[in-house]
Amino acid sequence: MTERTLVLIKPDAVARGYVGEILGRIERKGLTISALDLRTAPGDIAAAHYAEHEGRPFYPGLLEFITGGPLVAAVLEGPRAIAAFRQLAGGTDPVEKAVPGTIRGDFGLEAQENLVHGSDSVESAEREIALWFPHLAAN
């Protein structure tokens, strides 16, 4: 069964020149990139995207980071796309939990600026796709 996921290539990855490498890894994995947009995240979309973290100590810094420069938003499709991308991404903390061979394990330096975001469930994917690509929202 084909599944969709939202991926963000975060501002730190864009600034460090890793967009091509990350997209290449996605394509080599066999996932289809069905939507792609380079943009600076508007504050309202960023706040809605990270709403589950509101009130936590790191939330203001997270919003500042994600809106602080260009990022790439993408929709990926493929069998088990959510799990497949999360495997490519590696653990959230690039130094403590991400293994070499993953995006974060190979290029990540710190937990907050960890290069990429990938949806963690079908429900999250559909909610996030609707935020970043409203015209692709599931009916």
UniProtKB/Swiss-Prot annotation:
HAMAP family according to UniProt: NDP_kinase (MF_00451)
Function: Major role in the synthesis of nucleoside triphosphates other than ATP. The ATP gamma phosphate is transferred to the NDP beta phosphate via a ping-pong mechanism, using a phosphorylated active-site intermediate.
Protein name (Swiss-Prot/TrEMBL): Nucleoside diphosphate kinase
SUPFAM superfamilies: Nucleoside diphosphate kinase, NDK
GO process annotations (BP): CTP biosynthetic process; GTP biosynthetic process; UTP biosynthetic process
Enzyme class: transferase
GO cellular component: cytoplasm
UniProt cross-references to InterPro entries, sorted A to Z: NDK-like_dom, NDK-like_dom_sf, Nucleoside_diP_kinase, Nucleoside_diP_kinase_AS
Any Pfam family matching the protein: NDK
Enzyme Commission number(s): 2.7.4.6
Record's keyword annotation contains Kinase: yes
A molecular-function term among this protein's GO annotations: metal ion binding
UniProt similarity note: Belongs to the NDK family.
Subunit-level organization: Homotetramer.
Source species taxonomy: Bacteria, Bacillati, Actinomycetota, Actinomycetes, Mycobacteriales
